[in-house]
From Swiss-Prot:
SMART domains: VWA. InterPro entries: NorD/CobT, VWF_A, vWFA_dom_sf. Residues 232-243, 258-270, 292-306 have a biased composition (Basic and acidic residues). PROSITE patterns: VWFA. This is Protein NorD. Part of the operon norEFCBQD encoding nitric oxide reductase. Essential virulence factor, probably involved in the detoxification of nitric oxide (NO) produced in the macrophages during the innate response against infection. It comes from Brucella abortus (strain 2308). Residues 445-633 form the VWFA domain. It comes from the Bacteria.
Length: 633
């Protein structure tokens, strides 16, 4: 009753009511559609629309829009952030939530339209002009042409687009603009009316060659995604030092646009006696961490960095106090196309050129160093090993009996009777009257290829990923030994294309025993995951085996990546190509992953039915034998 006497609270509530909700577009939270709920469906739609299979869908980050603000917006923050849909060669960046219309179906239709639009968006378009006016007009021209192309290619989208245009016209804000800005806005409204099949009485406008001073871009239209062209950056030459397990790791955020830091040779040799003017130190609005070799930033910097429109990714020496997780969209690094000279080299697929890069990766093959003590298993794991061995012993081939043989340990009575009858009838008897038994041949050779990259050093549900992988590997290896299948175990990690290390835990002709168990216990985290080269090397060894059936079973915990150009779509396309090469050699390939987000990219790599996702890390030792039994038949 006396709340009005609290002046600060009263003024605060009044101010919040005045400018608390100043967004240009209305929001209807009760009818919102979340990207995370329909991402798989949209990915299928994108493939169906003819989109590239290795292109990923990621949430777009809200970025500052430079359109003209209303009075209340200027009184509030003085800026507006919009999660505008964007596309580059590797990613579709869609708003994490759409609540633009008071109709949930319309919000869902907008997602479907954006995916169809991006599927036919021209990726070879020229960069937009620097001038703001010319950039707006060029973007509108591209949007008009792309809409026409999408509606012509997919007639079923046209009624959807018509409804969306009508809804956008009803929701688009009307605000005072400068004369030239108003003319651009009229052009936007004309295109929307054209899409909604509404009459348009706007007259053609002749725009100047350049926008005048003070011209601000138009408010973006959610129906028309933008194209992000990223130029290649020079490859890095310095040694990479990945950070080992830190104290904390933040939660994942949306796709953050980032660029690599330009290398300044003066930073290589910095003297503490060189004076620096304070004016050179940048504010937090421009960068999170000042380039200093010893001090670490506070964890609050994660939140500050998350609010930036653009991040610059640099390399610093030393161990950070904390780790922050960002989903970065980096410009592609230029590919070093020089040939490598090594004992084992393999090609790599460059999807941009549509050709292989010969002798591009050097594989260093070596045995795993043994550990003095084997892996210690708890009572539950030991019980699982015994149970799996019993289950797999049933799969061990029995002995087959061959009838009507020239020699053997017993007589084939049917053959003897038949031979005597032939002689009694005046015919010629047969000497093939013996039985011979022999063990059935094992017709399967399998290679277990295990990812031991740095990410396996992470902890999930109070257990280290690599420790669980070791346990699962030990359980499965015991089972394979019990059923008698020929098996090899390889691990892989990488650090640039010149250092792809593949280590042998067990070879085909080696029996499973304490030595192999010690090697499994000795596995430790490496660096990065150059999956394509590792798969090609493992397949080359597997293809040499005489068995009729061959299986490459890959165990991994994340996307393929490396410290050089091998990341994003390049890595996905090369890994997908490598999987196709494996199958072309008559080898079945199957991937098992513990990455909970793997459903966004594994179907593109291994196809439908070519992978299994074990979301609960603790269940991996139980799941691996079951998966193997399914694959082994």
């Amino acid at each position: 009753m006396l709340d009005f006497l609290e002046l600060e609270e009263t003024v605060g509530r009044a101010w919040h009511r005045l400018i608390g909700k100043t967004g240009s577009w209305p929001q209807y939270p009760d009818h919102a559609v979340q990207l995370v709920d329909i991402r798989q469906r949209l990915a299928i739609c994108f493939r169906g629309f003819g989109g590239d299979i290795a292109v990923q869908i990621a949430p777009a980050r809200a970025r500052t829009s430079t359109h003209r603000l209303g009075l209340r917006q200027r009184m509030a923050l003085g800026e507006e952030k919009l999660a505008q849909p964007l596309r580059d060669e590797a990613t579709l960046m869609l708003p994490p939530e759409i609540a633009l219309f008071p109709d949930r179906q319309l919000n869902y239709d907008l997602y479907v339209w954006l995916v169809g639009y991006m599927a036919v968006m021209p990726m070879d378009a020229d960069a937009l002009p620097e001038d703001a006016l010319r950039r707006d007009l060029a973007a509108l021209q591209i949007a008009e042409q792309t809409v026409e192309r999408a509606c012509r290619a997919f007639p079923g989208l046209k009624p959807r687009y018509k409804r969306l245009c009508a809804a956008i016209l009803a929701e688009r804000p009307k605000r005072p603009l400068h004369r030239l800005e108003q003319q651009v806005e009229a052009r936007i409204l004309s295109l929307l009316k054209q899409g909604a099949d509404l009459p348009d009485d706007a007259l053609p406008t002749i725009f100047p060659h350049r926008g005048p001073a003070g011209y601000l871009p138009a408010l973006p239209v959610p129906l028309w995604p933008g194209l992000m062209k990223r130029e290649e950056v020079a490859p890095r030459t310095g040694e990479d030092e990945p950070v080992r397990n830190s104290q904390s790791e933040g939660a994942e955020t949306g796709r953050q646009i980032a660029q690599r830091e330009r290398q300044d040779p003066r930073h290589a040799d910095r003297s503490p006696f060189i004076l620096n003017r304070f004016e050179k130190i940048l504010a937090m609005a421009e960068m999170v961490s000042v380039d200093r070799p010893s001090d670490d930033s506070d964890e609050q910097n994660a939140k500050s960095a998350d609010e930036l429109d653009d991040l610059t990714l640099g390399e610093r020496k030393g161990r950070p106090a904390a780790r922050f997780r960002f989903d970065l969209d980096l410009p592609p690094e230029a590919v070093d196309r020089s040939l490598l000279t090594a004992e084992l080299t393999y090609p790599e697929w460059d999807y941009r050129k549509g050709a292989y890069l010969p002798d591009h990766c050097a594989v260093l093959a070596a045995p795993v160093q043994e550990k003095e003590k084997p892996l210690e298993l708890d009572a539950a794991a030991q019980s699982l090993v015994r149970r799996v061995r019993r289950q797999f012993e049933i799969l061990r081939p029995g002995r087959e009996v061959l009838r009507a043989q020239l020699d053997g340990t017993d007589l084939d009575l049917d053959a003897v009777v038949r031979s005597r009858c032939d002689l009694a009838a005046g015919g010629q008897g047969s000497d093939r009257v013996h039985l011979m038994s022999r063990p059935q041949a094992n017709d399967l050779a399998v290679t277990l290829l295990v990812d031991v990259s740095l990410s396996t050093d992470a902890w999930v549900d109070n257990r280290r990923v690599l420790d669980v992988e070791k346990e699962a590997l030990l359980v499965l290896a015991n089972g394979i030994a019990a059923c008698g299948d020929r098996c090899s175990i390889l691990t892989f990690t990488s650090r640039r294309r010149s250092w792809v290390r593949v280590e042998t835990v067990k070879d085909f002709d080696e029996s499973f025993g304490p030595t192999v168990e010690h090697r499994i216990a000795a596995l430790k985290p490496g660096f990065y995951t150059r999956m394509g080269a590792a798969m090609r090397h493992a397949t080359a060894k597997l293809a040499e085996q005489p068995n009729r059936k061959k299986l490459l079973l890959l165990l991994t915990d994340g996307k393929p990546n490396d410290v050089d150009h091998y990341e994003g779509r390049f890595a996905l396309e090369d890994s997908r190509r490598a999987a196709g090469e494996v199958r072309a050699k008559g080898v079945n390939v199957f991937a098992v992953t513990v990455d909970r987000e793997a459903s966004a990219y594994l179907p593109a790599l291994f196809g439908r039915g070519g992978y299994a996702l074990v979301a609960n890390l603790a269940k991996l030792p139980v799941a691996m034998p079951a998966i193997y039994r399914m694959l082994a038949g």
